[in-house]
Regions:
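Intrinsically disordered, low-complexity Ser/Thr/Pro-rich tracts
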Residues: 4-6, 445
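Ser/Thr-rich, Pro/Gly/Ala-heavy low-complexity intrinsically disordered linkers and tails
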Residues: 6-28, 39-125, 667-669
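Intrinsic disorder/low-complexity signal
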Residues: 11, 18, 34, 67-68, ...
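Sec-dependent signal peptide hydrophobic core
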Residues: 29-33
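Secreted, cysteine-rich disulfide-bonded mini-domains of extracellular proteins
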Residues: 103-116, 121, 601-669
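Sequence signature of WD/YWTD-type beta-propeller architectures
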Residues: 117-608, 631-633, 665-669
Length: 669
């Protein structure tokens, strides 16, 4: 028990969360609203399932310098003469195939440069696009130096945001007066991009690079480099700017599917609708998975095989995600056993969360259940010790479980070790506690060494519409708590924020991608913060942000899914987080939360691949100089994303074996 170390914002000691971060909005609907939504959905008809497409692995391949999924995250490309990967990641000699998923830019331009209409000169890619049909004379003016204007500011993205490859081009958003046209200039060691865009109204200037150009930009920014972005605008013949930001690019593409619950979604049926949707990298809209009948409060297994969810006010169930569309029922329960379940990584069983009694009026104890039969699984060391284990989560390797230890007086995050062969739990350890609020939603990093979790000002965090939330990490071995100030939107270690005035303290319900990608861990969480000018928060009587708790189709900042990079092996005392970015493809009017990013099903031997983690064998290589395919374990060391048992198996010095895959930490910027 760590009652003397309640969570704090100032200093690394753990004290009560300051009042300035203790009043705002949680990411969850009120009990009355959610119960009404569930009841309305139940009365509307039988439980529905969406016509979702089958999970796709999107195998990409590239030859030479860092094909990286051919620009869109799921394509192919060829070109260049150097291996597409960092030192030790060559897979086929000087002219062999490079990884189509995560290779660094090699000698020569990445193929995505020419796909975007760019030109290669040596290793430098030069791209010019003019989607705004800006006149040549105006282009010349925009390239000149303008005057400073404090109102002309970046609203989104945030400075120093780390972007992975394979996602949609972000929507750049700016404050200030109206604009007739904008000029975006992005440079790196091997990139020179120029884009000219149409203007916008005051406070609502938005623009996006073409998807091909964004893919080329992401591919051209290598390890240790950044995309240096400058934006200039012109209005009435007067040029303003430039204003600048820098964006590091992770040397890898995220892949798989994000499953999340939604309220008020058009895809799910409109106002007062509920359901579970999914987004895949590069998709512009979500796809229905399960809609109506109260299908919310879900969890998805890390391997993408299993979904667990509430069905109605009194039932819950487990479902297979391996079909060629929609879901297939596996097991049902007449209580909340599968509601917010902590699923084992392979989805075959899970730990029931403590009952959400205010919504479901159940008294479900935290117990292990099979997702295939619904039967209770006896769990030695747990059944005799834990009754109330809230929001449980297994580590990616399945050897640990973290949960809210609600059997104790204070809300506490605890963890236990787990032996899957005997279904035995042991070694109960309290990791962090909050004396006057809530700590909840623990999620392990892929290496199992750290737990990311949410703090909240209210003990009824799951349904309280006047709750704050910030995210912290705790070291499993030392129980050292660290703030994630940068992710949460704070500047330094104070309470000042780089977000709009209403937005601090609105971050909830984190999960983690189960593998390291591009040298980082990746957190997915719900936030009620503003999304630039496209979705602004409003102030309540306390001057803090308010959620749309009663009107899912209003214009206030509903919960949205955001994503942020977390450093691997950050030094003690250092915030490991980076600024978050909005997960594109969501519906702006919907209230979205609890995103689970799961991996696609692995591919069998001989199937094309981009990296080892796409293969059931764990290895992706070129055979006889041909295309990359899944192969049996070769002799020698393991490349990035290939199988390993220890870090000594990894080819490159400094690479780590994380969740049985070799991972390369990011180079110094």
């Amino acid at each position: 028990m760590m009652g003397s170390r309640a969570l704090a914002h100032s200093g690394d000691s753990v004290n009560a969360v300051p009042e300035s971060r203790s009043k705002a909005v949680t990411a969850f609907a009120t009990p009355t609203l959610l119960a009404a939504m569930l009841a309305a959905a139940t009365l509307a008809g039988a439980c529905g399932t969406g016509t979702s497409s089958a999970l796709g692995s999107g195998n990409g391949s590239g030859s030479g310098g860092g094909g990286d999924d051919g620009g869109g995250g799921f394509g192919s490309g060829s070109g260049g003469s150097s291996s597409g990967g960092p030192a030790g990641f060559a897979v086929g000699g000087d002219s062999g195939a490079g990884s189509g998923r995560s290779g660094d830019a090699g000698v020569g331009c990445d193929p995505s440069c020419t796909t975007a209409g760019g030109k290669c000169s040596g290793s430098t890619c030069t791209i010019t696009e003019n989607p705004g049909n800006v006149a040549t004379a105006t282009q010349t003016q925009l390239r000149g130096k303008g005057t400073a204007d404090s109102a002309f500011t970046w609203l989104y993205p945030y400075d120093n945001t780390v972007f992975p490859r394979g996602l949609l081009s972000p929507t750049l958003q700016f404050g200030g007066g109206e604009s007739d046209a904008e000029y975006v200039h992005i440079t790196s060691k091997t990139l020179d991009y120029s884009g000219y865009f149409a203007g916008g109204a005051a406070g609502a200037v938005t623009l996006s690079l073409s998807q091909n150009s964004w893919a080329a930009v992401a591919a051209a920014v290598g390890a240790g480099d950044v995309a240096s972005v400058q934006v200039t605008k012109i209005s009435g013949g007067s040029v303003t700017g430039p204003i600048a930001e820098s964006w590091p690019i992770a040397q890898g593409s995220v892949r798989g599917t994000v499953y999340y619950e939604t309220y008020g979604s058009t895809v799910a049926g409109g106002r007062n609708s509920v359901g579970i949707l999914k987004i895949q990298p590069g998709a512009t809209t979500p796809t229905a998975v399960m809609i109506g009948c109260g299908n919310v409060c879900h969890a998805a297994s890390a391997d993408g095989t299993t979904l667990a969810a509430a069905n109605t006010l009194t039932t819950s169930g487990a479902y297979s995600l391996l079909g060629d569309g929609g879901v297939t029922s596996l097991a049902t329960a007449t209580n909340a056993a599968f509601t917010y379940m902590g699923l084992y990584p392979d989805g075959t069983f899970g730990m029931a969360a403590t009952s959400f009694g205010a919504i479901y009026n159940q008294n479900t104890a935290s117990r292990l259940y099979s997702t295939r039969t619904g039967a209770n699984i006896p769990a030695a060391g747990w059944d005799s010790t834990i009754t109330l284990g809230g929001t449980p989560a297994f580590s990616p390797d399945g050897k640990q479980i973290a949960f809210m230890h609600e059997d104790e007086n204070a809300y506490t995050i605890a963890k236990m070790d787990f032996d899957v062969s005997t279904k035995t739990f042991s070694g109960l350890v309290d990791l962090a506690s909050e004396s006057s609020g809530t700590v909840a939603w623990p999620a392990f990093t892929p290496d199992g060494k750290t737990v990311l979790f949410q703090t909240g000002s209210s003990t009824t965090f799951e349904t309280d519409c006047q709750n704050t939330g910030d995210l912290y990490t705790v070291d499993v071995a030392t129980q050292t708590v660290r703030r994630t100030d940068v992710l949460d939107g704070y500047s330094g270690t104070g309470t000042a924020s780089y977000l709009p005035a209403n937005d601090p303290g609105l971050n909830f319900a984190p999960t983690m991608l189960a593998e390291a990608v591009g040298g980082y861990f990746w957190a997915i969480f719900t936030s009620h913060r503003s999304y630039g000018s496209l979705l602004a928060s409003k102030a309540n009587s306390d001057g803090l942000g308010v959620s749309n708790c009663t009107n899912p189709e209003g214009d206030e900042a509903n919960g949205k899914l955001w994503m942020a990079a977390i450093d691997i092996g950050a030094p003690a005392g250092q915030d490991p987080s980076h600024p978050a970015f909005y997960l594109d493809g969501q519906e702006l009017q919907a209230d979205n939360l609890r995103g689970y990013w799961v991996l696609p099903a692995c591919s069998n031997l001989g199937v094309g691949c981009g990296s080892g983690d796409e293969c059931c064998s764990g290895f992706c290589r070129s055979e006889s100089g041909g295309a990359l395919v899944c192969v049996t374990q070769p002799t020698g060391c393991s490349n990035v994303y290939e199988s390993c048992t220890t870090s000594a198996n990894c080819c490159a010095s400094g690479d780590e074996c994380i969740n049985s895959r070799c991972a390369a930490p990011p180079a110094a910027q």
